[in-house]
């Protein structure tokens, strides 16, 4: 008796060649609908699945493989006498191989103006049922969901007359990887359409491999880069950047680029951001990006070395010539003019990335792994909850207020405890990741290469004591923005008044860990 294979595929790459091989190996091929038509047109004899089920396709093809004659054939244990006797009694033949891939759900949800009805019709039911059944019974049944595995299976049959246990187990594992990914897309899409922002009892993310990385954060760590396969994720992200030049991105390059892009989204006016080790080392806004870059370089010409520089405007020849003078890992921008790209590409090891966009749309959750679990939260997209509250005797001037908002945007993206000192929409000093707030203040002040008279200071969380305000006052800081909310706010306000500092409360903090 010939072995039997069911073939029903949406992705028809390589299927004709593989089916011909199976026929050479003595397999009878059972098929459905479009696949049967395609194989027949290519000269391959197939058995209509309706001849096996002895039941017609119904409900516009929604029901065609969901039948005991199919699933009993797939699930029967071929060394179990009772199973074989049952098949014989019911006139059911065993099925030895299932070659199936699923309706294009992912491609459907990414189409513009797709309707929920279109999406629903592209949720496969029969396909997942067959491949899950075959995967469960992998000791006896071979299942293929990936065209890349056709050659492996064909070679083993040609060499050994059968597919090895190890390969069948490997292929079965791929089935559950495939169906879990498929179901995760459906779950997340339905949740999005329903505008359900609650945290689910079970949380899955449809991640698709984008790139194998040379190594992880350190050379002894293996790593990969995955993308989220959902259409409602912001397009302005590192995943959607186009690499125009340079070596492949490293794990750390990707992390730093992500930080740069997220910070850029805070600004509408021409802005330049320099990132090092996932923290901003300098940020500036100006009338054009030429001036913005000059301010960034002046702010911290040391830390920028070996860092990432990102812009929210087109990079021109003048900027590119300045960038070429120093060692940088990556330059990011929405556009590069021809001369600028030529200049940057003359640097062999410089990576040049083009942003897809900088628009803010719906986004996915912020997910952080911990040993044994994961923390899931909303992205910190809010800048200010309410209007600023002036709490000191002196109100900030219009210019101070502009600088305060600028500094507040930056401090939101600095590791806590975080302090940013700024003036003229340019960071003068950044206190990063200190274990107490006064150290963060002292760090930001000491790092500045400029006279801080008239500068402003932003703190990502409240001041627990007045010492931070005192240090700011002694350094010449004229205005402060902070969340407020400490039981000692009164002490900080009194200290600010003593130095004639204008201080405003935001009513919200921006911790970043």
Curated annotation (Swiss-Prot):
GO cellular component, one term: cytosol
Domain MGS-like: 1-145
Catalytic activity: (6R)-10-formyltetrahydrofolate + 5-amino-1-(5-phospho-beta-D-ribosyl)imidazole-4-carboxamide = 5-formamido-1-(5-phospho-D-ribosyl)imidazole-4-carboxamide + (6S)-5,6,7,8-tetrahydrofolate; IMP + H2O = 5-formamido-1-(5-phospho-D-ribosyl)imidazole-4-carboxamide
Alphabetized InterPro entries for the sequence: AICAR_Tfase_dup_dom_sf, Cytidine_deaminase-like, MGS-like_dom, MGS-like_dom_sf, PurH-like
Any GO BP annotation: 'de novo' IMP biosynthetic process
UniProt name for this protein: Bifunctional purine biosynthesis protein PurH
Gene it is expressed from: purH
Family per similarity comment: Belongs to the PurH family.
PANTHER family per record: BIFUNCTIONAL PURINE BIOSYNTHESIS PROTEIN ATIC, BIFUNCTIONAL PURINE BIOSYNTHESIS PROTEIN PURH
Matching PROSITE patterns: MGS
SUPFAM superfamilies the UniProt entry points to: Cytidine deaminase-like, Methylglyoxal synthase-like
Keyword tags: Hydrolase, Multifunctional enzyme, Purine biosynthesis, Transferase
HAMAP family reported for this sequence: PurH
Known EC number: 2.1.2.3, 3.5.4.10
Pfam families: AICARFT_IMPCHas, MGS
């Amino acid at each position: 008796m010939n072995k039997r294979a069911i073939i029903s595929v949406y992705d028809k790459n390589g299927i004709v060649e593989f089916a011909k091989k199976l026929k050479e190996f003595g397999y009878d091929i059972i098929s459905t609908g479009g696949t049967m038509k395609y194989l027949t047109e290519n000269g391959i004899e197939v058995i209509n699945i309706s001849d096996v089920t002895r039941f017609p396709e119904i409900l516009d093809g929604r029901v065609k493989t969901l039948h005991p004659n199919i699933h009993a054939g797939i699930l029967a244990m071929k060394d179990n006498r009772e199973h074989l006797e049952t098949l014989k009694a019911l006139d059911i033949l065993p099925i030895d191989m299932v070659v199936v891939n699923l309706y294009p759900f992912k491609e459907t949800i990414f189409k513009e103006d797709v309707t929920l009805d279109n999406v629903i019709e592209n949720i496969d039911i029969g396909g997942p049922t067959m491949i899950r059944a075959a995967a469960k019974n992998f000791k006896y049944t071979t299942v293929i969901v990936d065209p890349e595995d056709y050659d492996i299976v064909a070679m083993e049959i040609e060499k050994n007359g059968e597919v090895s246990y190890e390969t069948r187990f490997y292929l079965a594992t791929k089935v559950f990887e495939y169906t879990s990914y498929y179901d995760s897309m459906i779950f997340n899409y339905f949740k999005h359409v329903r505008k359900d922002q609650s945290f689910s009892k079970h949380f899955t993310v449809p991640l698709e491999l984008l790139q194998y990385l040379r190594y992880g954060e350190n050379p002894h760590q293996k790593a990969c880069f995955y993308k989220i396969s959902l259409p409602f994720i912001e397009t302005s992200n590192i995943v959607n950047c186009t690499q125009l030049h340079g070596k492949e991105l490293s794990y750390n390059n990707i992390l730093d680029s992500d930080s740069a892009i997220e910070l850029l989204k805070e600004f509408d006016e021409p802005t330049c951001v320099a990132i090092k080790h996932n923290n901003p080392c300098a940020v500036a806004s100006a009338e054009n990006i030429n001036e913005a870059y000059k301010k960034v370089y002046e702010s911290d010409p040391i830390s920028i070395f070996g860092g990432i520089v990102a812009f929210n405007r087109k990079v021109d020849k003048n900027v590119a010539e300045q960038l070429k003078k120093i060692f940088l890992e990556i330059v990011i921008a929405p556009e590069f003019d021809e001369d600028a790209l030529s200049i940057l590409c003359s640097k062999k090891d410089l990576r040049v990335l083009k942003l897809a966009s900088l628009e803010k749309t719906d986004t996915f959750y912020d997910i952080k792994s911990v040993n044994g679990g994961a923390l899931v939260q909303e992205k910190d997209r809010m800048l200010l909850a309410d209007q600023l509250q002036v709490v000191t005797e002196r109100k900030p001037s219009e210019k101070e207020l502009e600088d305060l908002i600028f500094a507040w945007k930056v401090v939101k993206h600095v590791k806590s405890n975080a302090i940013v000192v700024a003036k003229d929409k340019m960071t003068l000093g950044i206190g990063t990741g200190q274990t107490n707030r006064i150290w963060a203040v002292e760090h930001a002040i000491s790092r500045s290469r400029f006279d801080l008279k008239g500068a402003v200071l932003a703190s990502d969380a409240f001041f627990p004591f007045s010492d931070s305000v005192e240090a700011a006052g002694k350094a010449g800081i004229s205005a402060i923005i902070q969340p407020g909310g400490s039981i000692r706010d009164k002490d900080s306000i009194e200290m600010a008044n003593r130095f004639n500092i204008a201080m405003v409360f935001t009513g919200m903090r921006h911790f970043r860990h």
